């Protein structure tokens, strides 16, 4: 039986990942910030906001999956920016300290990250060979998160970094936010509309995470995005058609930056990111183009 330890296991990605892992011969320990009782013999919860939580984590953990982090979908006040950073690096450091104090380290760590690692560019295509240093707040979060995760290599753990694109899911996240203006017939171009949206269907993301965990030759950063990214204007048009709504309005960049503040970088300052590394290992995307993904997620 494979033993998993998961942070962020009750979130959008984590909950679906847990449901998929349960299909195998496994036991899952989920770290949460509140007391929770499990009715499933394959799942147990540990409240790591409480002192002594480390002693409740099983000794024989095989795989750690670290998804914990405060949502980006809130206004980035100075206080919340600190929360965005600390929620990621403190949880990762706590995991590292836990296993550093033990005789047995996990075989593999999967640590979430984001395509915000790469600088915004309208023409560059980014693959995993591209290396950079932080250039803005979001890239600094990603850079520090990955750096803290890489400490696990000192323990002999295989470290896999998953740089998530825009996750398309019916259970929350970006798609629900994107759909909202179209539901009120005010959807359209954002800024120039030429910025890239590197997206991924939630089902492909879950399968990609499991593929990387189970592939012993997988290590380092992986771009977890669909093979065919889209520019925002075409993305919006495709979404509008799937919803049978118009795609006619325009929100200028200046207005969006005034309304959203620094959070506007998530929708305006984006990158064209390609999943070359995971494809080279043989992973096949079920939803490789946006039309196919949205038709699956937006049913009549």
Curated annotation (Swiss-Prot):
Transmembrane segments: none annotated. InterPro entries: DUF1731, Epimerase_deHydtase, NAD(P)-bd_dom_sf, SDR39U1. Belongs to the NAD(P)-dependent epimerase/dehydratase family. SDR39U1 subfamily. This is Epimerase family protein SAOUHSC_00792. It comes from Staphylococcus aureus (strain NCTC 8325 / PS 47).
